C-alpha cells in the first residue's frame, strides 16, 4: 500500500486528469485496501490459535505466593478457623504482625472472633502483644466493649495496667458499663491501688530518665538518632515526657534536629497533642515556622482546635518578644557606635547596680562640693597678691580666645556694707573671693585670692560695691590671655594716677545704667574715663595700660582735681 506522501502526490496529479481516469484510480486504491485488511485478519487469527495451543499444552503453574504473616492475618480477618488451624499446625507463628505491629490476636479482638481468639491463645499467642502505638489485645477488646473476650484475655494473664502511647490503660478506654465493671472487678481482685496505677503511668518516663542519666554518666551523645532519624527529644515530645524533656534541654540538646521526614520535636508534640510539651519546646527556642519535607508547620499537624489556638498564641508571643529584642539590640548598637570601637562590652545592669552607681556619683559630687567650700573658706582669710597656678598643658593652645567677652561697664561698683572692714573715704574695697577658671585648651587656673584695692580718688558718694571680679565667677572657661588682661586691669585699679579715671567712670556707671556700654576689654580701644581719655594696654604683657590723651594734660588734670575732694 502506498504511503501517505505518495497518496498526496497522486492526488495532485489526479486533479488534472479527466473524470474517468480518476474513477479508475479510486477503484484501484480501494481494491488494495481490501486486500491489505484481509491479510491483517488472517494474521490475527493465526496468532490467536498459536496462543491457545500454548495454554493447552503448557499446564497450570503457580505464579503468586504470600508471606505467612499475610496469609495468617487474611485468614483471621475472614474468620476462617480451619485455615488458621492449618497455618498453626504448619508451624506458622501466631505472633506474626503487619507493618503496623498488628497481630492476628489484635484483629480477632477487634472483630469479636471468639473461636479464633481461643485457637490463637491455645497455640501460644502473646496475650500482651503491642502494636506500634503500644495497644494490647485487651485495649482493643475493652474499647470495643467485647466483654466475653475481656474475660478470656484476663484468664490468660492479660496486663490490666498496660499503658499505650497515649498513657491510657484498658479501663480508661472502656465505655461499656458491664465491660468496665468486669475490668474493675479484676483489678480489685488483683489488689491494684491508685498508687500503683500512678506508678505504672509514669513508669515509661522514669525508665527513659534512668536511661538518660546512664548516657550522661557514660559521656554519650544525647543527640543520638535511631533508624528513623528520631532523637530522644522526639520521643519525649511525642509521648509528653516533660521531666525527660527538661533533663535533655538542661544538658543542651538541640531542638531543631529533624528526622527522615523532616519532623522536629515540636512537630511530634503538635501531632500527638502534647500541649505542655509544645510550650516547653517553644520556650527553649523551637521554631513554630519550621516545615517538614511535606511543607507542613506544627500548627498544620494539629487536629484539636484548642491546640491550634494555643500554638497561635505562642507564635504571637514569640513574634512580640523577637521584635522587642530587635529594638533593644538596635538601641544598644546606636549607643555603642558613638563610643567608637574600643572593644567595650555592653551589658544590661540590674536595678541594684544602677542604684549603687548613682549613689557613688552623688557621694563624689558631695565630696567635690565640700572641698570647694573648704578651699573658699581658706582662701578668703588670705590677703595678698594674685597667685596663678597652671597645669602642664597651659601653653598648648597658641591662640587662646575669649569664650565670653565681658564689658568693663558690667563690672559692679558697689560693695555691701557688711563686707567693709573700715569706712570708705576716697576709695573702694573689694572683698576676697576664690574660684577657678577653665581654659579652652583644657588647662585650669586657680585664683587663690583677690587683694584689696583702695581707690585713692574714688567717689565718696558710693556706699557699697560688689567685687569687680564677681561677674567672672560664672564665666567659664577662661584663657591665659584673659587672665593676663584681668591682671593688667587689677594693676590699673591699684595705679595711683589711673585710679582717678576709673573711679569716676565706675561711679557714673552705677548712677546711670541706661547709658551705652563700653567696648570689650579685648578691643583695640577701651574708653575707661568719662573725660575723653582712652586707655591702651598690650595684650601679651602684664604691664600697666598706656594712656592716650585727646586733650592737654593740664585740662585733664583740672577736671580730675575738680571732681575729687580731700577728707
Swiss-Prot record:
<feature type="modified residue" description="Phosphoserine">
    <location>
        <position position="476"/>
    </location>
</feature>
<keyword id="KW-0564">Palmitate</keyword>
<keyword id="KW-0636">Prenylation</keyword>
<dbReference type="InterPro" id="IPR051226">
    <property type="entry name" value="PP1_Regulatory_Subunit"/>
</dbReference>
<feature type="propeptide" description="Removed in mature form">
    <location>
        <begin position="565"/>
        <end position="567"/>
    </location>
</feature>
<feature type="lipid moiety-binding region" description="S-palmitoyl cysteine">
    <location>
        <position position="563"/>
    </location>
</feature>
<dbReference type="Pfam" id="PF12796">
    <property type="entry name" value="Ank_2"/>
</dbReference>
<keyword id="KW-0597">Phosphoprotein</keyword>
<comment type="function">
    <text>Regulator of protein phosphatase 1 (PP1) that acts as a positive regulator of pulmonary endothelial cell (EC) barrier function. Involved in the regulation of the PI3K/AKT signaling pathway, angiogenesis and endothelial cell proliferation. Regulates angiogenesis and endothelial cell proliferation through the control of ECE1 dephosphorylation, trafficking and activity. Protects the endothelial barrier from lipopolysaccharide (LPS)-induced vascular leakage. Involved in the regulation of endothelial cell filopodia extension.</text>
</comment>
<dbReference type="GO" id="GO:0051489">
    <property type="term" value="P:regulation of filopodium assembly"/>
</dbReference>
<feature type="compositionally biased region" description="Basic and acidic residues">
    <location>
        <begin position="385"/>
        <end position="403"/>
    </location>
</feature>
<dbReference type="GO" id="GO:0061028">
    <property type="term" value="P:establishment of endothelial barrier"/>
</dbReference>
<dbReference type="GO" id="GO:0004857">
    <property type="term" value="F:enzyme inhibitor activity"/>
</dbReference>
<dbReference type="InterPro" id="IPR002110">
    <property type="entry name" value="Ankyrin_rpt"/>
</dbReference>
<dbReference type="GO" id="GO:0001938">
    <property type="term" value="P:positive regulation of endothelial cell proliferation"/>
</dbReference>
<feature type="modified residue" description="Cysteine methyl ester">
    <location>
        <position position="564"/>
    </location>
</feature>
<keyword id="KW-0040">ANK repeat</keyword>
<keyword id="KW-0175">Coiled coil</keyword>
<dbReference type="GO" id="GO:0005737">
    <property type="term" value="C:cytoplasm"/>
</dbReference>
<feature type="region of interest" description="Disordered">
    <location>
        <begin position="378"/>
        <end position="403"/>
    </location>
</feature>
<dbReference type="GO" id="GO:0005634">
    <property type="term" value="C:nucleus"/>
</dbReference>
<keyword id="KW-0488">Methylation</keyword>
<dbReference type="GO" id="GO:0019888">
    <property type="term" value="F:protein phosphatase regulator activity"/>
</dbReference>
<keyword id="KW-0449">Lipoprotein</keyword>
<feature type="repeat" description="ANK 3">
    <location>
        <begin position="228"/>
        <end position="257"/>
    </location>
</feature>
<feature type="modified residue" description="Phosphoserine">
    <location>
        <position position="333"/>
    </location>
</feature>
<dbReference type="InterPro" id="IPR036770">
    <property type="entry name" value="Ankyrin_rpt-contain_sf"/>
</dbReference>
<feature type="repeat" description="ANK 5">
    <location>
        <begin position="530"/>
        <end position="559"/>
    </location>
</feature>
<dbReference type="GO" id="GO:0017020">
    <property type="term" value="F:myosin phosphatase regulator activity"/>
</dbReference>
<protein>
    <recommendedName>
        <fullName>Protein phosphatase 1 regulatory inhibitor subunit 16B</fullName>
    </recommendedName>
</protein>
<dbReference type="GO" id="GO:0051896">
    <property type="term" value="P:regulation of phosphatidylinositol 3-kinase/protein kinase B signal transduction"/>
</dbReference>
<keyword id="KW-1003">Cell membrane</keyword>
<dbReference type="GO" id="GO:0016607">
    <property type="term" value="C:nuclear speck"/>
</dbReference>
<keyword id="KW-0677">Repeat</keyword>
<feature type="lipid moiety-binding region" description="S-farnesyl cysteine">
    <location>
        <position position="564"/>
    </location>
</feature>
<dbReference type="GO" id="GO:1903670">
    <property type="term" value="P:regulation of sprouting angiogenesis"/>
</dbReference>
<dbReference type="GO" id="GO:0042995">
    <property type="term" value="C:cell projection"/>
</dbReference>
<dbReference type="GO" id="GO:0048471">
    <property type="term" value="C:perinuclear region of cytoplasm"/>
</dbReference>
<feature type="compositionally biased region" description="Polar residues">
    <location>
        <begin position="504"/>
        <end position="515"/>
    </location>
</feature>
<feature type="modified residue" description="Phosphoserine">
    <location>
        <position position="350"/>
    </location>
</feature>
<dbReference type="GO" id="GO:1903589">
    <property type="term" value="P:positive regulation of blood vessel endothelial cell proliferation involved in sprouting angiogenesis"/>
</dbReference>
<feature type="coiled-coil region">
    <location>
        <begin position="15"/>
        <end position="55"/>
    </location>
</feature>
Amino acid at each position: 500500500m502506498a504511503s501517505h506522501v505518495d497518496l498526496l502526490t497522486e492526488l495532485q496529479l489526479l486533479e488534472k486528469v479527466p473524470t474517468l481516469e480518476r474513477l479508475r484510480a479510486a477503484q484501484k486504491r480501494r481494491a488494495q485496501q481490501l486486500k491489505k485488511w484481509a491479510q491483517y485478519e488472517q494474521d490475527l487469527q493465526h496468532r490467536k490459535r498459536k496462543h491457545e495451543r500454548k495454554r493447552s499444552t503448557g499446564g497450570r503453574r503457580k505464579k503468586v505466593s504470600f508471606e505467612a504473616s499475610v496469609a495468617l492475618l487474611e485468614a483471621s480477618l475472614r474468620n476462617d478457623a480451619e485455615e488458621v488451624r492449618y497455618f498453626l499446625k504448619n508451624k506458622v507463628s501466631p505472633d506474626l504482625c503487619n507493618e503496623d505491629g498488628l497481630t492476628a490476636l489484635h484483629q480477632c479482638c477487634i472483630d469479636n472472633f471468639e473461636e479464633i481468639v481461643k485457637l490463637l491463645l491455645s497455640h501460644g499467642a502473646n496475650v500482651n502483644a503491642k502494636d506500634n502505638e503500644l495497644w494490647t489485645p485487651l485495649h482493643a477488646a475493652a474499647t470495643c466493649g467485647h466483654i466475653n473476650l475481656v474475660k478470656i484475655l484476663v484468664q490468660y494473664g492479660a496486663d490490666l495496667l498496660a499503658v499505650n502511647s497515649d498513657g491510657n490503660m484498658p479501663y480508661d478506654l472502656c465505655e461499656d458499663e458491664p465491660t468496665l465493671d468486669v475490668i474493675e472487678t479484676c483489678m480489685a481482685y488483683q489488689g491494684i491501688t491508685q498508687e500503683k496505677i500512678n506508678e505504672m503511668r509514669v513508669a515509661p518516663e522514669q525508665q527513659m530518665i534512668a536511661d538518660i542519666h546512664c548516657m550522661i554518666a557514660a559521656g554519650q551523645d544525647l543527640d543520638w538518632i535511631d533508624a528513623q532519624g528520631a532523637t530522644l527529644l522526639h520521643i519525649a515530645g511525642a509521648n509528653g515526657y516533660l521531666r525527660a524533656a527538661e533533663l535533655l534541654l538542661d544538658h543542651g540538646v538541640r531542638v531543631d534536629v529533624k528526622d527522615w521526614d523532616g519532623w522536629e520535636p515540636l512537630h511530634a508534640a503538635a501531632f500527638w497533642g502534647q500541649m505542655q510539651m509544645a510550650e516547653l519546646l517553644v520556650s527553649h527556642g523551637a521554631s513554630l515556622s519550621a516545615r517538614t519535607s511535606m511543607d507542613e508547620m506544627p500548627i498544620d499537624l494539629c487536629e484539636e482546635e484548642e491546640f491550634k489556638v494555643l500554638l497561635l498564641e505562642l507564635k504571637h508571643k514569640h513574634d512580640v518578644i523577637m521584635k522587642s529584642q530587635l529594638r533593644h539590640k538596635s538601641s544598644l548598637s546606636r549607643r555603642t557606635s558613638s563610643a567608637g570601637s574600643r572593644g567595650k562590652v555592653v551589658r544590661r545592669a540590674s536595678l541594684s547596680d544602677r542604684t549603687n552607681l548613682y549613689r557613688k556619683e552623688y557621694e563624689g559630687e558631695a565630696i567635690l562640693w565640700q572641698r570647694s567650700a573648704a578651699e573658699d573658706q581658706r582662701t578668703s582669710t588670705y590677703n595678698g597678691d594674685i597667685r596663678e597656678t597652671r597645669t602642664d598643658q597651659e601653653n598648648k593652645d597658641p591662640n587662646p580666645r575669649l569664650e565670653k567677652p565681658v564689658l568693663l561697664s558690667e563690672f559692679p561698683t558697689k560693695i555691701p556694707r557688711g563686707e567693709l572692714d573700715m569706712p570708705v573715704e576716697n576709695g573702694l574695697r573689694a572683698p576676697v573671693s576664690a574660684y577657678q577658671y577653665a581654659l579652652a585648651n583644657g588647662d585650669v587656673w586657680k585664683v587663690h585670692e583677690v587683694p584689696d584695692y583702695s581707690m585713692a580718688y574714688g567717689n565718696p558718694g558710693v556706699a557699697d560695691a560688689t567685687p569687680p571680679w564677681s561677674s567672672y565667677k560664672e564665666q567659664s572657661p577662661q584663657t591665659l590671655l584673659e587672665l593676663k588682661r584681668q591682671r593688667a586691669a587689677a594693676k590699673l585699679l591699684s595705679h595711683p594716677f589711673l585710679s582717678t579715671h576709673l573711679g569716676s567712670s565706675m561711679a557714673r556707671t552705677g548712677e546711670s545704667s541706661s547709658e551705652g556700654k563700653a567696648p570689650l576689654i579685648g578691643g583695640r580701644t577701651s574708653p575707661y574715663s568719662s573725660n575723653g581719655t582712652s586707655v591702651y594696654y598690650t595684650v601679651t604683657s602684664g604691664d600697666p595700660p598706656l594712656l592716650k590723651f585727646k586733650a592737654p594734660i593740664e585740662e585733664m588734670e583740672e577736671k580730675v582735681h575738680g571732681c575729687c575732694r580731700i577728707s
